[in-house]
Amino acid sequence: MSADLVALLYLAAGVLFILALRGLSSPETSRQGNLFGMVGMAIAIVTTLAYHPPADLGAWGLVVLGLAIGASTGAVIARRVPMTAMPELVAAFHSLVGMAAVLVAAGALYAPAAFDIGTVGAIHTSSLIEMSLGVAIGAVTFTGSVIAFLKLSARMSGAPIILPARHAINIALAAAIVALIVFFARTESHLAFWLLAFAAFAFGVLIIIPIGGADMPVVISMLNSYSGWAAAGIGFTLGNSALIITGALVGSSGAILSYIMCKGMNRSFISVILGGFGGEVAGPAAGKEQRPVKQGSAEDAAFILKNAGKVIIVPGYGMAVAQAQHALREMADRLKKEGVTVRYAIHPVAGRMPGHMNVLLAEANVPYDEVFELDDINSEFGQADVAFVIGANDVTNPAAKEDPSSPIYGMPVLEVWKAGTVMFSKRSLSSGYAGIDNTLFYRDNTMMLFGDAKKMTEEIVKAL
């Protein structure tokens, strides 16, 4: 296969990956986006094997074995992992990309001739720089993603873990990583390579553990970006333009998404990375006097909903925890049969990963044309008879609009309080990730529905 044909095929794969990203940006075209991505990846793999065929039968066996293991594992995951576990699954996949970057860099260090980058002890300087950057980014991505996976899957506390003098430790470790990159690029020291890898592994842990569970959408986007740049680093080491293109696409899209997520929380990217914000708060904000709230039953809610003309449902992380999306869809179907107009309002940072609520609603087969983003539906709350909030706390807090002293002041929120009646399904009056009371709880037009979100929604369905 000629180099020109390979370049053309890699370009075609890159275009398909761009189309995949475009398709995955909307639920209506997500299946098409997945198909584009699959075809692009197939072209890239076949082209690579044809241009650099394994040297012997044993090498072919390893390639086939690797493909079989990867394909079968992917198939099992696709069939068995529930949609509610998508955030931790995404984090786990990011970790694999990071570790792949580390292993490829290690392979290039010990067998440079196989990568056509020189010989042992005489590797090209440019390749050493690429390898050092690849292993640093890859190692940070791996351990950072593992910590994110543990937090998201509740195998580790989602609250921030604050170490004494953590900023000084991180600065010192970052400086050591930079120094090791320079030293390795100048000396090709194997010891420096592994010290760099372990320093980056530690750095990945230290920058993620102080980040609270509710900041995970930004973390997932950030790790997505890291994994892309790690893949691009692998591409440079392997001399594979398709991998460079793909890595750059993932890296840049992840960075853009991180910016969008930060904007949606009215936070700076640096403030998220510095951590210490986003911890789970077990009870009402400390020092706050308990205020009376209106509490309703499932029967009360069903009566009001049934007689409403327009209902806007606002899902949040509480829906994901309770896995209430199917019950919510059933409730919406019952209301539509009664002639009620039903819409869903999604905040960009609701949940624990970008698009978390969209994924869960799609799993419950909620029609795409009923789901709206914040900017598209905020103006409709004033015309809604009922806003049904299910586990969306800080993203519905009026303090973001009305209280300049609030930590979340200026954060874009869903203006649910403008609806005729607000129904808030929640276990208790506990604070959200910002650690502040939601003043929505105490408004005259708010009715609290205490209890498990799924059970409460199912009881409302029965009452309907």
Regions found by a protein language model. Give the residues of each.
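Structural signature of hydrophobic alpha-helical transmembrane segments
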Residues: M1-G14, P54-S72, S127-F142, E188-A199
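Alpha-helical transmembrane segments in multi-pass membrane proteins
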Residues: G14-I18, F36-T48, L62, G66-G70, ...
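C-terminal ends of transmembrane helices
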Residues: L16-T29, A71-V90, S145-P160, F203-M216, ...
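Cytoplasmic-side transmembrane-helix entry/capping segments in multi-pass membrane proteins
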Residues: R31-G40, V63-L65, A85-V97, P160-I171, ...
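Transmembrane alpha-helix boundary signature
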Residues: T48-V64, V76-A85, V102-V120
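Transmembrane helix-loop junctions at the membrane interface of multipass transporters and ion channels
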Residues: G107-G121, R186-L191, V218, S225-I245
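Membrane-interfacial segments at transmembrane helix termini in multi-pass membrane proteins
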Residues: L249-A308
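Structured cytosolic domains appended to multi-pass membrane proteins
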Residues: E289-L464
